Amino acid sequence: MDKAVYPVAAYAFLALFVLATVFELFFAFKERTLYRKMVKPWCVLFLTVFAIVFLPNWHGALIMLGAFLGCVGDTLLLKKGHQRYFIAGAISFLFGHYCYIAAMLLYASPSLAPIHYIAFGLTFFVLIASLIVPTMKITKSKGVGAAGALYLSSLIMVPLIAFVLLGVTGQNYFLMIGLGGLSFLCSDCYLAKTRFIKHDRREDFYIMGTYLLAQFLIVFGLLLCFA
């Protein structure tokens, strides 16, 4: 496994991520929408650059791609009230989750047997089947509901796989990744609630707080696995 490098530049971008996150959450709490939107795309972008500088190999590139797709999703979701941007953003996040899942399985592959992959696949399809009716009812659309079931199932698979791999490999960093996956799940479920059911005051503060925590835990946990 390649050794990670830790140049000053990597920690500089991590510091920029933290700084941008502080500003983002401050503006979200104060409900300064314009300023919050100006800062939002930069948060995960700094985390993306941190990933590839911290681990400049193809493992780092895969993790970076997952974070970058999150950054693209962040930018697309700035267009509130536009269905096509919302769908495009969700697709970007979806493939970002798949990058994270691929990175986890890649790391754990020496410890996995075929039965593990079969179990993951069956669990994924059971989740889709069990969620498709509720998501259709919430979104009041068959197409959006079906897509929502696919997205939510993929999102659930991130912490589920992480916790399974924690037990299989004994790698403690999977606990960090699993907690990040749960935080991502909280963020997106609350986002769906505010979009399809009821808006809340300071909703962006809670959405972005859990989301940025999730991205950090997942990305940094994966980087440390391969370091």
What is each stretch, according to the model?
Residues 1-227:
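Polytopic alpha-helical membrane-helix bundles and their juxtamembrane interface segments
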